[in-house]
Amino acid sequence: MLCTPCDTAIHASNSRAMSNMLIHRIFNIDLWLVGVAHFVILFASFQVPYRLGWKQDLRQLRAFNRKLLWVQSGFTVLTIIAFGTLTLALHAEFLRGDRAALGLAGFIGIYWTTRILVDTIYFSHADWPTGTAFLVGHVLLTLLFSFLAASYVGLFIWHVWLRPNG
């Protein structure tokens, strides 16, 4: 039995093309996951006022400071909704490496990386509420933030420095 020569990536041992195809597939799935993950974060964030006793604690603040905290929290929620929505809506643009999408990916990656750094450097372990539920929640959220940061930074790096013709 004779086989005819073939010039596909598999037969030509073009491992770089195969690697880029695999990375493209991984980011294709990854972008759907990180887009949805932002809405998972919102589920956790909507529990914060109740679980952390904001109703009691915020009474101690002057009205302006209390309103300021609520407004800043609202803008944080709006930012997370925008990140998730834009990631899902611009999925193809992120995968293609369009300039605006890469700018957004870089910004979102920096946002989540900064969130992790603030948690690690600024907050002390003693600052966090005690109890197993808070410990597990904190670990899971930090892992999710890390996944988001790695995904967006990884996509940016792949398009800008690692991808052929990038």
Please name every model-derived segment.
Residues 32-35, 70, 74, 102-109, ...:
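Hydrophobic alpha-helical segments of membrane proteins, primarily the transmembrane helices
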Residues 150-166:
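Juxtamembrane boundary at the C-terminal end of a transmembrane helix
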Residues 137-155:
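Final/C-terminal transmembrane alpha-helix of multipass membrane proteins
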Residues 19-30, 36-79, 89-97, 130-134:
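Interfacial loop at the N-terminal end of multi-pass membrane proteins
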